[in-house]
Amino acid sequence: MLRTYLTVIPLQGRSDLEQMVYAREGSVPPQATRFPIVQVIRDTLAPGDTAQVLTIRQENADTARSYQLLLEELAGLGIPESSVTQLTLPENQHADTLVRLCRDVADALPQITRVYACITYGTKSIPVVTLAALTCAEATHTELEVGGIYYGEVKRRDGRTESASLNDVTVLYQLSGLVGGVRDSTTAEEVFRQLVWISEHREG
């Protein structure tokens, strides 16, 4: 199976991008990483699978350094740089920039694949663009399935890291897809019942 992993390169400087152990319920024992998507890859990539990584990077010196750090971690998993695609954009929040990014992400996704996306890093607008691109690709691609949406959460107290966890937030993506069916349902409760059923029967 071709598994595609979509992530955003963090804006933090190198000194602020520390390695974390992102705990995840039901996963293989987590290992320290700067990038939650690396833990997702460890959890989902099976023998015989092919991995492709798409990265969204706003162009500046910090993201260029962080991109190299990601390549190093991916190489440790046996994923070469030739399997990684950069989607770059300027450091602005202009509507045309974000619309272009949405199109670029959808175009870069393979026609037949299972996609896993990490929405931890980047400006607040980029997760919105990411989810919109996935919705578009699911509708237009031959056989594209969203396997999971993840968010890496770090809890701190008094400036010190207490814990880090990898949260599966796929249910929120599924909710956005079901909302369009509210008009055809007697009550919104029917939509949420569908959502619960889907989340309980989702493949990994």
List each language-model region with its residue ranges.
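Short Gly/Thr/Asp-enriched flexible loops that form oxyanion-binding sites at enzyme active sites
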Residues: 124-139
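Detector for conserved single-position "signature" residues within domains
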Residues: 117
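Long, low-complexity, Lys/Arg-enriched
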Residues: 1-114, 135-204
